Amino acid sequence: MRNPYDTDDRKSFREMVTKFLETEIWPHVDEWDEAGQYPQEINEKVCELGVFGFGIDEKYGGLGFDDQFMRKDVSVEMGRTSAGGLFASVGSRNIMLGPLTELASEEIKMKALPDLMSGRKGGSLGITEPGGGSDVAQMKTVAHKEGDEWVLNGSKTFITGGMQASYFVIGARTGKEGLGGISLFFVEADTPGFTRSAIEKKMGWWTSDTATLYF
């Protein structure tokens, strides 16, 4: 009996992803890793496949549907390339899409999502902090309101995709200690007072763009 979830659409999608990886990624993996970077157009080519568009409305450039089996297939096929650093960097937008699509205003979504879906711009999630790691309950970055604006003060580190990202979702403390006092902020890379620096000489995943962010 045929697996009812192994549909023709899923098979075609998997084959498309595999063909792309075999022709566009595998031949260059070692070269890009040694160089510590990859061509910007790879972001756009990967995004053209739709691999980050699951669960995102078509009006934002997404696929307009979700499929957990197709998501799994993407992960499996990407894993076969041994290009973990590359896909960590290209895929850094993926870990910010959840909070962005669920919590952001329509104005922010219309601004950022089409850019992220097309690969024209990158995005990252900023949670991990120097000295505290990813223990969200102990987050030290703070935000306070001045007039109609929020001002962030602190830093984040080991942020995947942080040097090339144009958009960030940043966690900051706005209330009491612990998990209950954390808010998320949409931050653009050209925001006054925001700077970043690259983390170099890593043990591996050299293609992965990794940064420390300062507010």
Where are these regions (language model features)?
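Flexible, small-/acidic-enriched active-site or ligand-binding loops
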Residues: 138, 190-215
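Cytochrome P450 C-terminal beta-domain/meander region
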Residues: 135-153
